[in-house]
Swiss-Prot record:
The lineage of its organism: Eukaryota, Metazoa, Chordata, Craniata, Vertebrata. GO terms for biological process: defense response. This is Cysteine-rich venom protein 24. Residues 1-23 are annotated as: Disordered. Disulfide bonds: none annotated. GO terms for molecular function: toxin activity. The keyword Cytoplasm does not apply.
Length: 23
């Protein structure tokens, strides 16, 4: 498992969730 890409994916997913919550 590449922890660097894992954390990047988590950050991207969190940004997506934040966008949906902002709507």
């Amino acid at each position: 498992v590449d922890f660097a890409s894992e954390s990047x994916n988590k950050r991207e997913n969190q940004q997506i969730v934040d966008k949906h919550n902002a709507l």
